């Protein structure tokens, strides 16, 4: 019984401490430095749901199953030569494909290096330039997977004088003045690994949510969620935290990694941060939210009593002829009742323990009485034995007294008879014989 009580107490203590210790899963400190994109204060009422937004279109996973990064380069020209302004696509090339030259006129006349996506040299070569080639050229690099777009603009002017041929920077773009009929090279070099390398996709794209309770520095933050583009999802901490704080399943499909915290409590206050890492695309962003929980506005308990006479039958699903009682309890009350429930449950447990303890002590004391009674009983037996002895004695005594009442001679006779019966007779005979003589 005593052991059971101890066990119960231990269990109670363990339950309370587990809540504290399971919560402190450390966040990975080895994250590369992220750019803090935003710091926001968010306050929400207790019991409500808070949404901490964290969205980035660049984190959308395009599931490039071809293992081709969907990198593409295209050269366009903005020309005013024919009087009207027009934009024309000259050529393009995919990272895992051949280059396409759009007009037949340019076929064989303009070209890009075939190894552009391994070398990072996307420069355009135009042979036999004509006056009609004048215009603003743009080298466009698109990385569909990383949602990156880069453009380099170069202005090409044609001159008929060899002396006038030159290259300069006009403050916005490079300007090349080329001699008519010559071969020009419009430079577009980008050796950033994003444009030249291949990586394994899934491991490179990860989203973390961290939480710092008030007063805890960022390097000791608790990790809440890790989410990988491959679909792997890791949640940390006790189950109630995992159920309470979650991000949607479609996060990588929509680029929405917003954290939803349901049933806000005061204990949920703290600093939350969303880390978006796209290692391949070089994206490292951090969004910070300070969450404050405010007391809900005190609602008055509303008891709405409506008799069936006055109740308007708007909803056909509602059963008619019943009194409708709407009882609205403010959420703070619900919280209060929860707390009360906890307190009562704990109290009940202690009462049970107390009863057990009282029971044990009572049992012990009872055992003590029995022991004493047994001793008494033994003594009684002794006393009985003694009384038996004394009665015997009195019997003897009363006999003696009876003997005293009798004649002394008789007594003597009796004594003599008792001690020497045969001899007495002999002596008597002898005495009589002597007397008769
Ligand atoms: C957020 O709240 C903190 C503490 O109350 C305050 O110091 C800070 O100025 C607030 N920041 C913003 C952006 O409101
Ligand atoms: C890029 O390629 C063009 C054409 O092949 C070449 O003329 C140029 O030197 C290259 N540039 C670099 C920086 O390698
Ligand atoms: C979090 O949300 C996802 C998708 O909505 C769900 O599959 C998962 O079970 C949730 N996690 C917990 C611990 O409730
Ligand atoms: C009471 O309930 C009725 C319908 O059930 C509604 O029309 C009315 O507005 C309610 N009154 C209050 C004070 O909530």
Curated annotation (Swiss-Prot):
Species per Swiss-Prot/TrEMBL record: Gallus gallus (Chicken)
Tell me if tRNA-binding is a UniProt keyword of this record: no
GO biological process terms, alphabetically, are: cell adhesion; cell differentiation
Query: Localized where?
Result: Cell membrane
Give the matching Pfam families: V-set
GO CC entries: cell surface; plasma membrane
List the Cytoplasmic topological domains. 361-437
- Membrane-side (Extracellular) residue stretches: 23-339
Ig-like V-type domain mapped to chain residues: 32-159, 167-294
> What binding partners and quaternary form does the record give?
Homodimer in cis. Does not appear to form trans-homodimers.
> Which PROSITE patterns does the UniProt record give?
IG_LIKE
Task: Indicate yes or no for the key word tRNA-binding.
Answer: no
Return the protein name: Matrix remodeling-associated protein 8
Q: Which residues are glycosylated?
A: 41, 121, 246, 304
Q: What role does it play?
A: Transmembrane protein which can modulate activity of various signaling pathways, probably via binding to integrin ITGAV:ITGB3. Mediates heterophilic cell-cell interactions in vitro.
Q: Which domain of life is it from?
A: Eukaryota
- Gene3D superfamilies cross-referenced by the UniProt entry: Immunoglobulins
Q: Which gene encodes it?
A: MXRA8
Query: What residue range is the signal peptide?
Result: 1-22
């Amino acid at each position: 019984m005593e052991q059971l009580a101890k066990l119960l107490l231990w269990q109670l203590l363990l339950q309370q401490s587990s809540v504290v210790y399971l919560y402190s899963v450390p966040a990975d400190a080895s994250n590369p430095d992220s750019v803090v994109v935003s710091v926001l204060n968010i306050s929400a009422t207790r019991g409500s749901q808070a949404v901490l937004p964290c969205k980035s279109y660049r984190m959308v996973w395009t599931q490039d199953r071809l293992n081709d990064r969907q990198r593409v380069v295209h050269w366009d020209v903005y020309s005013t030569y024919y009087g009207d302004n027009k934009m024309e696509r000259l050529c393009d090339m995919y990272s895992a494909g051949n280059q396409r030259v759009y007009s037949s006129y340019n076929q064989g006349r303009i070209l890009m290096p075939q190894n552009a996506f391994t070398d990072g040299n996307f420069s355009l070569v135009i042979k036999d330039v004509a006056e009609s080639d004048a215009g603003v050229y743009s080298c466009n690099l698109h990385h569909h997977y990383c949602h990156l777009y880069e453009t380099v603009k170069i202005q090409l002017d044609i001159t008929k004088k060899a002396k006038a041929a030159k290259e300069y920077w006009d403050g916005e773009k490079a300007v090349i003045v080329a001699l008519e009929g010559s071969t020009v090279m419009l430079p577009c070099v980008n050796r950033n690994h994003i444009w030249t390398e291949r990586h394994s996709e899934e491991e490179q794209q990860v989203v973390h949510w961290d939480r710092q309770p008030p007063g805890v520095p960022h390097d000791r933050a608790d990790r809440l969620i890790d989410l990988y583009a491959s679909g792997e999802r890791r949640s940390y901490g006790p189950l109630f935290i995992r159920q309470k704080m979650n991000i949607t399943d479609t996060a990588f499909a929509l680029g929405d990694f917003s954290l939803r915290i349901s049933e806000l409590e005061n204990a949920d206050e703290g600093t939350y941060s969303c880390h978006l890492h796209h290692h391949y695309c070089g994206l490292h962003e951090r969004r910070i939210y300070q969450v404050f929980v405010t007391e809900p506005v005190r609602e008055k308990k509303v008891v709405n009593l409506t008799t069936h006479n006055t109740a308007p039958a708007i909803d056909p699903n509602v059963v008619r002829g019943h009194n409708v009682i709407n009882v609205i309890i403010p959420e703070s009350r619900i919280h209060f009742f929860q707390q009360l429930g906890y307190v009562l449950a704990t109290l009940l447990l202690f009462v049970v323990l107390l009863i057990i303890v009282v029971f044990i002590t009572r049992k012990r004391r009872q055992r003590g009485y029995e022991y004493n009674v047994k001793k008494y009983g033994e003594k009684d037996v002794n006393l009985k034995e003694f009384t038996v002895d004394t009665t015997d004695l009195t019997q003897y005594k009363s006999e003696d007294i009876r003997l005293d009442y009798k004649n002394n001679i008789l007594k003597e006779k009796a004594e003599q008879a008792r001690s020497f019966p045969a001899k007495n007779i002999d002596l008597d005979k002898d005495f009589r014989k002597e007397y008769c003589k």
